[in-house]
């Protein structure tokens, strides 16, 4: 598995991030787009390792993720592009690999100095920015360019952000969607 070099800054203002990136001569490479994903448990069950099938409507990927810690390089991933979201989901089902959850979020993507800057909006929690790059040094430098201190960053994965920061257990939710959350809040 390859190491990802990524950190998140929680509870951000998406407009401020966009203005800052563009002022630094970065570029927007993806408008705010709905991402849909199915997550699957691995066998044997390991809370820190899972399979993710994700699409943004244009590109669909299948990945296995393994979080080994909370540092900038502690997420391992193997990912490949697949042809179609629903067909890949049906294939997983036919292999006996059952969906753990269905999740949605919105993502806007920017590039700046070799880093990918992703503004993520998820149900029930404030937006956050994820910075991913080829090296931990580029990740930390980008955090500083955006006006943050690296000590403000976390290496927590999404599920851990929900659980440890916001006290919401999404690991046992069959779906995490904006419209279903809105219905529950009414």
Region annotations inferred by a language model:
Residues 68-71, 125, 137:
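Short, surface-exposed beta-strand-loop junctions and turns on beta-sheet-rich folds
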Residues 14, 139-140:
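Short, well-ordered alpha-helical microsegments
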Residues 65-67, 122, 134:
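Surface loops and adjacent helix of pleckstrin homology
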Residues 1-116, 149, 153-186:
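N-terminal strand-loop-strand beta-hairpin
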Residues 136, 142-149:
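A hydrophobic, small-residue-rich beta->alpha segment in the mid-to-C-terminal subdomain
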Residues 118-126:
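A contiguous pocket-lining binding segment that forms or flanks enzyme active sites
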């Amino acid at each position: 598995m390859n190491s990802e070099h990524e950190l998140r800054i929680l509870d951000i203002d998406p407009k401020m991030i966009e203005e800052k990136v563009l002022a630094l001569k970065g570029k927007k490479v993806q408008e705010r787009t709905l991402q849909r994903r199915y997550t699957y448990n691995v066998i044997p069950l390991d809370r820190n390792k899972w399979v993710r099938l994700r699409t943004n409507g244009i590109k669909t990927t299948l990945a296995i993720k393994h979080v080994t810690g909370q540092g900038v390089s502690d997420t391992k991933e193997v990912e490949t592009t697949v042809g179609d979201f629903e067909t890949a989901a049906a294939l997983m089902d036919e292999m006996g690999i059952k969906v753990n959850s269905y999740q949605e979020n919105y993502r806007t993507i920017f590039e700046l100095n070799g880093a990918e800057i992703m503004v993520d909006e998820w149900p029930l929690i404030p937006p956050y920015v994820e910075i991913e790059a080829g090296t931990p040094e580029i990740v930390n430098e980008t955090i500083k360019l955006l006006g943050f201190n690296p000590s403000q960053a976390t290496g927590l994965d999404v599920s851990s952000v929900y659980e440890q920061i916001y006290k919401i257990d999404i690991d046992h939710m069959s779906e995490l969607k904006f419209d279903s959350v809105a219905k529950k809040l009414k």
